[in-house]
Amino acid sequence: MQVVVRDNNVDQALRVLKKKMQREGIFREMKARRSYEKPSERRAREKAEAVRRARKLARKQAQREGLLPGKKRAA
């Protein structure tokens, strides 16, 4: 993965690199490869993630339909 450094602006190049790595899922993969995960633990984690996604989707849909109040925004 390459990032162009313009005008010796290393901070901006690092931000761009981190954003690219985040989009590609490199941080998640590094965390997963840090230690072995048993297949049963992997299934349990994936199931929990699926449940979390389903709840989030249902909550967003209920907010759109007006059944739940929306997020409170700081003024």
Curated annotation (Swiss-Prot):
GO BP: any one term: translation
Alphabetical UniProt keywords: Ribonucleoprotein, Ribosomal protein
GO cellular component, one term: ribosome
Transmembrane segments: none
An example Gene Ontology molecular-function term: structural constituent of ribosome
Domain of life: Bacteria
Region (Disordered): 33-75
Keyword Ribosomal protein among UniProt keywords: yes
Biased composition (Basic and acidic residues): 33-52
Similarity comment text for this entry: Belongs to the bacterial ribosomal protein bS21 family.
Protein name: Small ribosomal subunit protein bS21B
Species the sequence originates in: Chelativorans sp. (strain BNC1)
